[in-house]
Structures are given as structure tokens and as C-alpha cells.
From Swiss-Prot:
Binding partners and assembly: May form a complex with LTO1.
Positions of the UniProt region annotated as Disordered: 1-44, 102-122, 150-170, 192-213
The protein's name: Protein yae1
Keyword Cytoplasm: yes
Major localization class: cytoplasm
Region entry deca-GX3 motif, spans: 49-89
Cell location: Cytoplasm; Nucleus
Xref: InterPro entries: Essential_protein_Yae1_N, Yae1-like
Amino acid sequence: MTSPQTNSLDDIFGSSPPHEGEKFSQQASIEAPEPSDLPSLRRQHVTAGYRDGVSAAKGEHVQHGFDAGFPIGAQLGMRAGTVIGIIEGLLRGFESPTASRAVKKPLQRKEEGQGVETDEAEAARQAKREQLLRLYQKAVKELEVRSVFAGSEEESTRDNGGQEKPEVVLRRKGDAVISQWEEQVRVAHWEENMAALEPKEDEKRASTPTEQI
């Protein structure tokens, strides 16, 4: 069986039967296009899945992060509060005027040179107060939370590529800052004095009168 004779004008008027390659191209072009709302629907599902994944991850890891980070923050906060409290107590002591004493002595005639010594003592007290005030303002600024933990993320990434636990980095960073202030204020010395002033438990029991039946 011979193939049908092709006419040179078939390409123009389209009277000749289509070839096999032409059938395939025509079928591909006739296929229905993808609905226009399908890409938008896909994006919505991806967004919803992403949000669900974030919520699930938060539920699993937030409690672990709280358990690991809260004790460290509480410990460092107590140490920083002790430093600021000591400086604040000293500052209040120097702010207390001499005239506010509970028992006032009767006025006496000033002897020669007594007024000069009083003025010098007052000037020294004011100078010490100004020094403590500057120290107090500096401590409040440097022991603020953002200042204590500043650069923790960069330090962790630089040292071990972010492999170290965040709470370990925060503890090391905070301890380095607060320890400097503890040495400057001599917190250990103040704690020893406070411990010596506190009555022992045995002394409390001995001084407390026993009830008689």
C-alpha cells in the first residue's frame, strides 16, 4: 500500500492528513491547563503546614528552654542585685544628714577650729557620696540584662560554631561581668560581716524563754 501523495499546497491550505509528529504536538496543546487557583491553594497549604510545625516545635522545646535557662538567670540576677544593693546602702548612708539623728545634743559654743573641721568633714562626705553615686549609676547600667548578656550569640558562633548550648554561653558571659563587680564591691567581705551579725540558731533558742505549762 502506497502512502498518499503529498501536495505542495497542503502546508498552506491544510488539506493533507496530519503526520505522526503533528498528532503528538496537537494532543499536547489540547490538554487542559492547570487551574489558576491551584498554585494559590498550594501556597496556603504550605503556609498552614509551616505554622503548625512551628507551633508543635514551640510546645516541645519552650518548656525545656525554660527549665534550662530560668535557674541561670535567677542565680545571676540575685548576684547582680546583691552588688547594686550594697552600693545603694552605702549611698544612702552618706546621704543621711547629721541633723536627722534621733537624739539631738544641746547646742554648744563652737571652739576655735571646730567649724573648720566640720566643714572639712562635710566636704569629704559629699565627695565620697559623689563617688558612690557615679559607681552606682555605672553598676546599674552595666548590670542591666541586655548589657550582661550582650554578644553571647556572636561569642558562641565564633568559639565553636554554635555547637555549645545557649544556657552555657549565657552563664559564662554573665558570670564574667558580675564577678568583676563582686570583686570591686567586695561582696564576699560584706557577706562575712552579715553572717557574723546574724545570731546563731542555738543562741536564739537559748535566749527564747520556754513556756511553762
